[in-house]
């Protein structure tokens, strides 16, 4: 090997290896101190892109979980208030049944009506004051809300909260009363037993209820017979002996029409639309109608509570799935981005040794030109 002065090849080689060892050592120290295998695009350009996409998705999943929990909180708040609404309606039904009893005097029915009015006020107060973060839930203002329970656009679920005020149309129905008064001698006679009730249901389809009354039944027995034949229409008798019929507003898109020989005799007329808000149990007939109206209201409230319960379960399952996806994505991202400490520690020790060796070799290589000077002197 030639001995030169201008170019110290050995020193250059040693310096290159020293620089490489130093660079690799710095990389290992950076990974060990940060905990990340990828700290910049130069470490792994493709891996950095994949890792960033995974982290974006994981952040979205975290927000989706929080959104779903907010939805559950809203539903729990609303459902808790509706539980009290149910209790109030049940108490109002008890009062209606009590007032319908013939043992009550007019004064006692007035007292019962006063409690009914107080309960109605409380029912409306609950509907007006139940709120979540300042947003009213049960007075009809909430309507629909969209809850983003996914990490991407389009992964939203609609939540509806219904109006729980006592004047809501869903909490009532149409009442009818016969013009004819049935005295103690009144009976269903032969040839006058047919009562046909026709209406258009909420889906726009024609419905027809046919009642073939039993000959010899009095007006109370006729009402009982009608109730046994259909669950769409409820029948009762007021204190004057008039037949009363009621159908929930949600069952029909219009009013009832009556035909048949018995209908001609009874002469059924529309009394009006009754809701919980305008119930009057100061008479036996009003109390009987109130029971039917409150039954409609209870079905309405309980039905919506069931919907909210099902939606809460749906949100809980959505959260479980989001957590599971987040867990798997975090594991995937860790495999791509996180540093392997066993590997990096080994690499660090290796590069430290190489750095020390390269430093020693470089020092020796730099002494080689001195041998040329030694030759010249001798």
Curated annotation (Swiss-Prot):
GO terms for cellular component: bacterial-type flagellum; extracellular region. It is found in: Secreted; Bacterial flagellum. SUPFAM superfamilies: Phase 1 flagellin. InterPro entries: Flagellin (IPR001492), Flagellin_C (IPR046358), Flagellin_C_sub2 (IPR042187), Flagellin_hook_IN_motif (IPR010810), Flagellin_N (IPR001029). It comes from the Bacteria. Pfam families: Flagellin_C, Flagellin_IN, Flagellin_N. Residues 98-139, 311-339 form a coiled coil. GO terms for molecular function: structural molecule activity. The keyword Nucleotidyltransferase does not apply. Keywords: Bacterial flagellum, Coiled coil, Secreted. Its main location: secreted. The keyword Cell membrane does not apply. V.cholerae is able to differentially regulate the flagellins within the flagellum maybe to produce flagella which are particularly suited for motility within a given environment. Flagellin is the subunit protein which polymerizes to form the filaments of bacterial flagella. FlaE is not essential for flagellar synthesis and motility. Belongs to the bacterial flagellin family. Heteromer of multiple flagellin subunits including FlaA, FlaB, FlaC, FlaD and FlaE. This is Flagellin E.
């Amino acid at each position: 090997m030639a001995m030169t002065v201008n170019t110290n090849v050995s020193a250059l080689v040693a310096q290159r290896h020293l620089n490489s060892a130093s660079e690799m050592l710095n990389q290992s120290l950076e990974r060990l101190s940060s905990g990340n295998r990828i700290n910049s695009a130069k470490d792994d350009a493709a891996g950095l892109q994949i890792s960033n996409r995974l982290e974006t998705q994981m952040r979205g999943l975290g927000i989706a979980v929080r959104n779903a929990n907010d939805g559950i909180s809203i539903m729990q708040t609303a459902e808790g208030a509706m539980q009290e609404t149910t209790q109030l309606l049940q108490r109002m039904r008890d009062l209606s049944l009590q007032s319908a009893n013939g043992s009550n005097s007019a004064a006692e029915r007035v007292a019962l009506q006063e409690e009914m009015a107080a309960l109605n006020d409380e029912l409306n107060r609950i509907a007006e004051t139940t709120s979540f973060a300042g947003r009213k839930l049960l007075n009809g203002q909430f309507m629909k809300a969209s809850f983003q329970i996914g990490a991407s656009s389009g992964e939203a679920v609609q939540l509806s909260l219904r109006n729980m005020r006592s004047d809501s149309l869903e909490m009532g129905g149409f009442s009818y009363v016969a013009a004819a008064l049935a005295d103690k001698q009144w009976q269903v006679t032969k040839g006058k037993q047919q009562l046909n009730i026709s209406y258009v249901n909420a889906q726009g389809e024609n419905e027809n209820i046919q009642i073939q009354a039993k000959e010899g039944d009095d007006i109370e027995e006729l009402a009982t017979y009608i109730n046994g034949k259909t669950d769409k229409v409820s029948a009762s008798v007021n204190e004057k002996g008039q037949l009363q019929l009621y159908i929930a507003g949600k069952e029909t898109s219009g009013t009832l029409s009556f035909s048949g020989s018995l209908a001609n005799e009874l002469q059924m007329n529309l009394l009006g639309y009754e809701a919980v808000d305008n119930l009057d149990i100061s008479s036996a007939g009003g109390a009987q109608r109130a029971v039917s109206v409150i039954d409609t209201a209870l079905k309405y409230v309980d039905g919506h509570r069931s919907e909210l319960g099902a939606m809460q379960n749906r949100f809980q399952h959505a959260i479980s799935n989001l957590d599971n996806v987040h867990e798997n994505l975090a594991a995937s991202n860790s495999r791509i981005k996180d540093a392997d400490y066993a590997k990096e520690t080994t690499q660090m020790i290796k590069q430290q040794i190489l750095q020390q060796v390269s430093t020693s070799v470089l020092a020796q290589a730099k002494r080689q030109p001195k041998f040329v000077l030694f030759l010249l002197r001798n």
